[in-house]
Amino acid sequence: MANYFNTLNLRQQLAQLGKCRFMSRDEFVDEADYLKGKKVVIIGCGAQGLNQGLNMRDSGLDIAYALRKEAIAEKRPSWRKATENGFRVGTYEELVPEAGLVVNLTPDKQHSAVVQAVQPLMKQGAALGYSHGFNIVEVGEQIRHDITVIMVAPKCPGTEVREEYKRGFGVPTLIAVHPENDPKGEGMTLAKAWAAATGGHRAGVLESSFVAEVKSDLMGEQTILCGMLQAGSLLCFDKMVADGVDPAYAGKLIQFGWETTTEALKQGGITLMMDRLSNSAKLRAYALSEQLKQLMQPLFEKHMDDIITGAFSSGMMADWANGDVKLLGWREETGRSPFENAPQFDGKISEQTYFDHGVLMIAMAKAGVELAFETMTRSGIIAESAYYESLHELPLIANTVARKRLYEMNVVISDTAEYGNYLFANAAVPLLKEAFMGNLQVGDLGKPVADGEIDNARLRDVNEAIRQHPIEIVGAELRGYMKDMKRIAVAN
């Protein structure tokens, strides 16, 4: 199989990278009706598989779970989760032939084996669904021409998908139809119904493409969403301890600081996050972020280039074939890091202290979000897609760090995201150690910035630069559709 994106000519590549349309709410007046009366069979009962299934069932759809025979016989966690929630469970052979829609929600590295197992069992004219297009775009999986191939990609972890639905809302969602597999022209109608069944239509849906979703998703998770959190956590902890800060305090400030400070992004973008700082701290955070952007731009561009060409995917798939030797080695190395093994801090840290003592962390978040967005849009990805794959998801991933530090983040994200995260962090950490961390000042991390004289013109210009960044402009519009989403819990 050949990388699908690389089989396209330049015009086709640009067209698919740039496909992005915010859909109006009146396009979903029929909600999930088109799928009612059809049997929907989900393969995979992880966080996305279970929670999407629960939402779809509550929306009136007929949902069952197809699992491997061994998973059923051995009563593995996937079988237990499905049966404990009252779903019908069966083997591929029992359930797939009757399905109008088969939804593949297994991990990326299992997709080829799963799709090759279920394709011969799917009835003529059925549909195959994904929530991430890696198998189609990067692996180049060939699907039978009578099968419609669609994607519904919620831009949140599975638990959020469920919780927002239970509140009568939903999470922002990308939908797409594979242009090589829409024989009856019903792909978009099917995708809209599936998105509505998960509640996504209440929070905003982007009509995208498999290509745009995959390339932007890979870029976001490798750089700002996971890689920057990993690199920033390791660097900031080591810096504070070297400066004499109690390791327990440093560990807590970082573990919960990402979550607390980036919560402001969800409510009001980079503007609000920076507005939580004093004027002196804001000016310092802005200056640090500009230095970071200049240093890291080539690294962000390298990741984007490797994603576009397929070099990243081919390297990762080679590691799959080699038993995940690199991935598992990097995971073990992270587990041995001083930050992961820092003692617990029993004292309380106020919400504002996370901002006041975390100026460098805020600068890192700002620089990473803006660089990821800028790099994606310069590569042909539309601003709305770039926003969802950078700023929007950052507080959600930061929330996983708050649970059990980097271990939890790397458990929750996909193996694909974890592999890319390590690639980025392994390059970013030595780069910033050598060229940046040694130039920090007192007040950048672990202590507040001292108040000083403020130049009104300078403050005016910085405020204007923050507010007029393109991600702030598109973000203000998109957040308008998400204003009812619940606030992520902030530690104290």
Swiss-Prot record:
Identify which cofactors the protein needs according to its UniProt entry.
Mg(2+)
A GO molecular-function annotation: magnesium ion binding
Span of domain KARI C-terminal knotted: 209-344, 345-485
Give any Pfam family that matches. Answer: KARI_C
Q: Give the EC number(s) under which this enzyme is classified.
A: 1.1.1.86
Family matches, as InterPro entries? 6-PGluconate_DH-like_C_sf, 6PGD_dom2, KARI, KARI_C, KARI_N, NAD(P)-bd_dom_sf
Q: List ligand-binding residues for Mg(2+) 2.
A: 217, 389, 393
Q: Which residues are NADP(+)-binding?
A: 45-48, 68, 76, 78, 108-110, 158
Keyword check for DNA repair = no
The keyword Signal is assigned to this record: no
PROSITE patterns noted in UniProt: KARI_C, KARI_N
- List the pathway annotation: Amino-acid biosynthesis; L-isoleucine biosynthesis; L-isoleucine from 2-oxobutanoate: step 2/4; Amino-acid biosynthesis; L-valine biosynthesis; L-valine from pyruvate: step 2/4
The record's Gene Ontology biological-process terms are:
isoleucine biosynthetic process; L-valine biosynthetic process
The chain positions of domain KARI N-terminal Rossmann read 15-208
What's noted on cofactor binding? Binds 2 magnesium ions per subunit.
Q: Which residues bind substrate?
A: 414
What does the record give as the active site? 132
> Entry's SUPFAM superfamilies?
6-phosphogluconate dehydrogenase C-terminal domain-like (SSF48179), NAD(P)-binding Rossmann-fold domains (SSF51735)
User: What's the catalysed reaction?
Assistant: (2R)-2,3-dihydroxy-3-methylbutanoate + NADP(+) = (2S)-2-acetolactate + NADPH + H(+); (2R,3R)-2,3-dihydroxy-3-methylpentanoate + NADP(+) = (S)-2-ethyl-2-hydroxy-3-oxobutanoate + NADPH + H(+)
User: Gene3D superfamilies in the record, alphabetically?
Assistant: N-(1-d-carboxylethyl)-l-norvaline Dehydrogenase, domain 2, NAD(P)-binding Rossmann-like Domain
Keywords associated with the record: Amino-acid biosynthesis, Branched-chain amino acid biosynthesis, Magnesium, Metal-binding, NADP, Oxidoreductase, Repeat
Quick one: which residues bind Mg(2+) 1? 217, 221
Entry function: Involved in the biosynthesis of branched-chain amino acids (BCAA). Catalyzes an alkyl-migration followed by a ketol-acid reduction of (S)-2-acetolactate (S2AL) to yield (R)-2,3-dihydroxy-isovalerate. In the isomerase reaction, S2AL is rearranged via a Mg-dependent methyl migration to produce 3-hydroxy-3-methyl-2-ketobutyrate (HMKB). In the reductase reaction, this 2-ketoacid undergoes a metal-dependent reduction by NADPH to yield (R)-2,3-dihydroxy-isovalerate.
Q: Which family does it belong to?
A: Belongs to the ketol-acid reductoisomerase family.
Its recorded name reads Ketol-acid reductoisomerase (NADP(+))
Q: Give the organism the record lists.
A: Sodalis glossinidius (strain morsitans)
